[in-house]
């Protein structure tokens, strides 16, 4: 599937098996990125959006540039996508005000470690010096509790509210947030907690060697 969709023999054959859905979609309102199309120079439709998006990624970005950005901006800088304790230390060194432990929902690199698995080592490295948040894999209130009990200051969601948006629009987003809130409330009650600030490792049973011995294996491979 591409954006915008391209009519190929394969997609046409697929559409032929779903003709009722196809007819319904023909009469549906056209969707676009209203916060970008028509507001950014040179972006007038969805077709030109892809090229513009690709141009926003700077392959030469490094820690020195982040430090310079922090200096020029003068405001708070939060770095998302940290999956390694050494990167967390570098984020602290260049002046980041907080970091988000994230593998971007697992949609950038299929083999990336899960955020929750690397969270303990990152907290051990910098958790007492910088706020550490987490996203990727948060689907329920129980997931929120697990992350915060391990030491994250907060969590973020993506797909969870998008599902609600797709099903019911704005009301669906509100419903998704309420569901997660109720799940968190219920889970806390069953754990004997009334305040998220009181959550901790005592609320969890973490499997032995949960983080894995990744560094040891890497070292052995380089020996």
Roles of regions detected by a PLM:
Residues 80-81, 102-103, 136, 158-159:
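Short beta->alpha connector loops at strand-helix junctions that form conserved
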Residues 72-76, 92-106, 126-129, 151-155:
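Glycine-enriched alpha-helix->loop->beta-strand junction motifs that scaffold or abut catalytic
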Residues 1-93, 105-108:
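Active-site entrance/lid segments in N-terminal catalytic domains of soluble metabolic enzymes
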């Amino acid at each position: 599937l591409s954006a915008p969709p391209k009519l190929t023999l394969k997609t046409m054959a697929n559409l032929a098996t779903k003709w009722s859905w196809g007819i319904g979609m023909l009469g549906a309102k056209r969707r676009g990125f209203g916060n970008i199309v028509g507001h950014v120079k040179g972006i007038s439709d969805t077709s030109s959006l892809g090229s513009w998006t690709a141009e926003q990624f700077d392959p030469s970005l490094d820690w020195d540039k982040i430090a310079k950005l922090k200096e020029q901006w003068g405001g708070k800088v939060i770095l998302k996508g940290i999956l390694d304790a050494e990167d967390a230390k570098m984020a602290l060194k260049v002046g980041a005000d907080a970091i988000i432990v994230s593998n971007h929902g697992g949609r950038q690199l299929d083999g990336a470690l899960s955020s929750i698995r690397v969270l303990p080592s990152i907290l051990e490295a910098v958790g007492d010096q910088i706020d550490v948040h987490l996203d990727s894999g948060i689907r329920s209130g129980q997931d929120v509790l697990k992350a915060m009990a391990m030491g994250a200051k907060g969590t973020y969601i993506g797909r969870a509210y998008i599902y609600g948006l797709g099903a019911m629009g704005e009301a669906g987003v509100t419903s998704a947030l309420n569901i997660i809130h109720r799940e968190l409330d219920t889970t806390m009650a069953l754990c004997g907690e009334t305040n998220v600030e009181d959550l901790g490792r005592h609320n969890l049973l973490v499997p032995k060697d949960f983080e894995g011995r990744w560094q040891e294996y890497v070292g052995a491979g380089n020996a």
